[in-house]
Amino acid sequence: MATSASRIAPTTPQSSHSRAWDALTPPLSEWILDAISAMGFSRMTPVQASTIPLFMAHKDVVVEAVTGSGKTLAFLIPVVERLLRLESPIKKHHIGAILISPTRELATQIYNVLLSLLAFHGPSAARLQRTENNSGEVDESNPASSYPPSTLKIVPQLLLGGTTTPTQDLSAFLKQSPNVLVSTPGRLLELLSSPHAHCSQSSFEVLVLDEADRLLDLGFKEDLQKILQRLPKQRRTGLFSASVSEAVDQIIRVGLRNPVKIAVKVKGAGLEDKRTPASLQMTYLLTPPTHKLPAVKYIVSTLSPTPQRSILYFSTCAAVDYYQHILPCILPDRFTTIPLHGKHPPQVRQKNFTRFVNSVTSSILLTTDVAARGLDIPAVDLVIQIDPPTDPKAFLHRCGRAGRAGRRGLSVIFLHPGREEDYIAFLNVRKTPVTEFQSTSTSTPSQLYSSSHFSASSPKNPQTFHPIQITTADATSTTEKIRALVLRDRAIHDKAQRAFVSWLRSYSKHQASSIFRVADLDWEELGRAWGLLRLPTMPELKGFTGDRNLGVSGVDWDNYAYKDRQREKHRRMEMEGRSSSNVNNNGDATGSDKGPLKRPATSESIPWSQNLERKSEKERRRERKKIRRYHEQWKKMTEEEKERVRETEQMVNAVRKAVQEQDQTVTREEEFEGFD
């Protein structure tokens, strides 16, 4: 490992014992050493050894480190130490530290690691325990507590959109008076807009932006700008990411004061800088589209030991929705597939993520780039990228879900033979080199992520490695299995059509457009790879002269039914109505050979007035349903609960009024200029 830092004096190379936790200056508290020991971390990682002393010594830091290098503890420990070394406790409803992450999953992960630390700090653990027991009602004068109210303690609060309402978050904030907030940008901004939440110069200490480059991405800039306007300029700020260098022009504008820039990288066998952990082997596999799923089956089945947790990356949410039905019929029964993407409701995302993290059997997560950044999923052995990422920056983050914290891992990216092979050289230029995925033999399990065969540059027995062999018969058999499954339920056919179209749109928007070209695609090969019964109607196929039915014949589209009875009933009613309409207008019914029945007129093809009336009626029904649910909940409440609701509503109304007045008032204070 090599560490580089700016604006600090050069130091001699650190020996291995200097990465001991008790060798830090200033020293860590005894309870933190106990917590770290209980977590099983015997030594600091290079990023922790470089960052913790500087962040604790009143320095702003910009940290670029390979994924899985321990960045979370590198900022949590300094934050906790700073707050617990204050001269006096932070005032009620005043905030001492804010930790911002781009996703709910990553924010939850940071919060859980923080709770694990605080479990070893007596006053903080006691306060959190009392908060749980009393449902948020904390009595600081409780004589049963062994710690006086003046004792310094950490009280965190997790703020996530979609899981709680802003009203519930504000209510919890007022009851618990947390001094550390872990949040996503949008929900944090809503809380900071309240006049009851204070980030004064006397109390606010630290701001941390995790996955900083993504936080500064489109969609987060405006929220960050407003958040920074509400924070004092005299603060410590830390930015942590695996690829800070690509967003440094924007990061400089965030408001850091003379930051120390820390870059922790990996030295490869040829002493070249790499941006990936040495314990992670990154490989590629050149394979035609029809061979991808057989290759997935081969890899997960032959690796030894069998990967307990694997991640399959797709380019779109629709592809995940489709393949969650397809893969169980392709893979061995011992593997469980779990879908996760950004369009799932928050409760489903959290449920599936927890299910995957806590799985005790071999599990495969089917996901998009929503699970590519920051998530520390324990013991991920294998990452397979079915689709190369649209944004090349995501490649590194996808691979980094495996090989974390020194654990060995394997990453494989699938590329089509031909022009896509140029992506290999493209990755080398970006200091993320990949080697060809190979098997030890055709009869023995691959040992590619075992210690004896791990190094791609110097394998123990290089002559025993061979490219994996997927036959045409394997590909044909897989396509037939998929089509047999699709024919059982028209809903899966619909998902296949949507997924294929969304995949094509994603492919056409690839930033490396000279490598990933729609004009080079083999449509019939792709259709068979996806198990389609026919190619969807798309502008890209306007000049296509091949077989749109992909060799599939004998499908009775009129009687091709949905498994869901209600949905099938609705389809048949639509079909009958359309048939009668065609008979009345044209004297003849539309035959089934014309293709699938068209959907009823959309909002774009009906009169504007009817469309507006339809939307208004939906809104009225939704509002009536909301009021009905509210009255049902109100009837079940006790008088005490009703009183709390009234108080909360009064507070929210007061907040709204104050915010409106604040927006209407023209201030002459210096404004944050934002990101160019």
Swiss-Prot record:
One of its GO terms (biological process) is rRNA processing. PROSITE patterns: DEAD_ATP_HELICASE (PS00039), HELICASE_ATP_BIND_1 (PS51192), HELICASE_CTER (PS51194), Q_MOTIF (PS51195). Keywords: ATP-binding, Coiled coil, Helicase, Hydrolase, Nucleotide-binding, Nucleus, Ribosome biogenesis, RNA-binding, rRNA processing. Residues 1-18, 131-149, 453-465, 578-589, 602-611 have a biased composition (Polar residues). CDD domains: DEADc_DDX55, SF2_C_DEAD. Residues 566-577, 630-645 have a biased composition (Basic and acidic residues). Residues 439-452 have a biased composition (Low complexity). The keyword Hydrolase applies. GO terms for cellular component: nucleolus. A motif (DEAD box) lies at residues 210-213. A motif (Q motif) lies at residues 21-49. Residues 52-262 form the Helicase ATP-binding domain. It catalyses: ATP + H2O = ADP + phosphate + H(+). Residues 610-664 form a coiled coil. Component of pre-60S ribosomal complexes. Belongs to the DEAD box helicase family. DDX55/SPB4 subfamily. ATP-binding RNA helicase involved in the biogenesis of 60S ribosomal subunits. Binds 90S pre-ribosomal particles and dissociates from pre-60S ribosomal particles after processing of 27SB pre-rRNA. Required for the normal formation of 18S rRNA through the processing of pre-rRNAs at sites A0, A1 and A2, and the normal formation of 25S and 5.8S rRNAs through the processing of pre-rRNAs at sites C1 and C2. This is ATP-dependent rRNA helicase SPB4. The lineage of its organism: Eukaryota, Fungi, Dikarya, Ascomycota, Pezizomycotina.
